[in-house]
Curated annotation (Swiss-Prot):
It comes from the Eukaryota. It comes from Homo sapiens. This is Large ribosomal subunit protein uL13. The modification Phosphoserine is found at S77. Its main location: cytoplasm. The gene is RPL13A. Associated with ribosomes but is not required for canonical ribosome function and has extra-ribosomal functions. Component of the GAIT (gamma interferon-activated inhibitor of translation) complex which mediates interferon-gamma-induced transcript-selective translation inhibition in inflammation processes. Upon interferon-gamma activation and subsequent phosphorylation dissociates from the ribosome and assembles into the GAIT complex which binds to stem loop-containing GAIT elements in the 3'-UTR of diverse inflammatory mRNAs (such as ceruplasmin) and suppresses their translation. The lineage of its organism: Eukaryota, Metazoa, Chordata, Craniata, Vertebrata. SUPFAM superfamilies: Ribosomal protein L13. The modification N6-acetyllysine is found at K191.
C-alpha cells in the first residue's frame, strides 16, 4: 500500500473554525495532517469577547471531582486540536483513528521547518473576513488564560526565520552561479544540444 502523503498546513492567518472544519474533513478521508504555527491562528470577533467566552468555559468543571474533566487546554495547538475533535465522531473507532492522523504544533519544529507549508484559501482571514471586522489571535488568548510559552515560542520563531534567511541567500547565490555556468558553456555544447533536440530528449 502506498504511503499516505502528509499535508503540512501553516495555521498563521487562518480562521479557527473554518480551518478546523477543513482539517476534520481531511483526516476523516484518511489524509495525515500537520498544522504548525497554531499561535498565529485568528478568531473572528474582538479579543475581549473571545476572552470572556473562554473564561466562561474555564468555569465548567465537575464539582465533586474537577480532575475528571472537562479539561481546559491552554496551549494554542491544543485549543485548535480540541476544536477539531469537536467536529469528529471521536468516541467511535473511525473518529479516534481520524484524530490520530492529526498533529498540531506551536511554532514550526523540525522536521517541518524544512518542508513546504500550505495555506487553505477558504479559511484565510483576508479572504473570509471583511477588512473592518475585528479579530483576535489565538496565541494572545492562550497567553492570557494561562499558556506559559508565548515568549519561548516567539524566540524560537525568530531563530528559525534567521536560519531560513541565510539558507535562502545561499540558495539564490547557487542559482546565480549555476545560471552563469550554463551561459559560459552554452556555445561549447550547442552542437550536442541540437543532437539531443532532434532525438526529442530536449525540448
Amino acid at each position: 500500500m502506498a504511503e499516505v502523503q502528509v499535508l503540512v498546513l501553516d495555521g498563521r492567518g487562518h480562521l479557527l473554525g473554518r480551518l478546523a472544519a477543513i482539517v476534520a474533513k481531511q483526516v476523516l478521508l484518511g489524509r495525515k495532517v500537520v498544522v504548525v504555527r497554531c499561535e498565529g491562528i485568528n478568531i473572528s470577533g474582538n479579543f475581549y469577547r473571545n476572552k470572556l467566552k473562554y473564561l466562561a468555559f474555564l468555569r465548567k468543571r465537575m464539582n465533586t471531582n474537577p480532575s475528571r474533566g472537562p479539561y481546559h487546554f491552554r496551549a494554542p495547538s491544543r485549543i485548535f486540536w480540541r476544536t477539531v475533535r469537536g467536529m469528529l465522531p471521536h468516541k467511535t473507532k473511525r473518529g479516534q483513528a481520524a484524530l490520530d492522523r492529526l498533529k498540531v504544533f506551536d511554532g514550526i519544529p523540525p522536521p517541518y521547518d524544512k518542508k513546504k507549508r500550505m495555506v487553505v484559501p477558504a479559511a484565510l482571514k483576508v479572504v473570509r473576513l471583511k477588512p473592518t471586522r475585528k479579530f483576535a489571535y489565538l496565541g494572545r488568548l492562550a497567553h492570557e488564560v494561562g499558556w506559559k510559552y508565548q515568549a519561548v515560542t516567539a524566540t524560537l520563531e525568530e531563530k528559525r526565520k534567521e536560519k531560513a534567511k541565510i539558507h535562502y541567500r545561499k540558495k539564490k547565490q547557487l542559482m546565480r552561479l549555476r545560471k552563469q555556468a550554463e551561459k559560459n558553456v552554452e556555445k561549447k555544447i550547442d552542437k550536442y544540444t541540437e543532437v539531443l533536440k532532434t532525438h526529442g530528449l530536449l525540448v
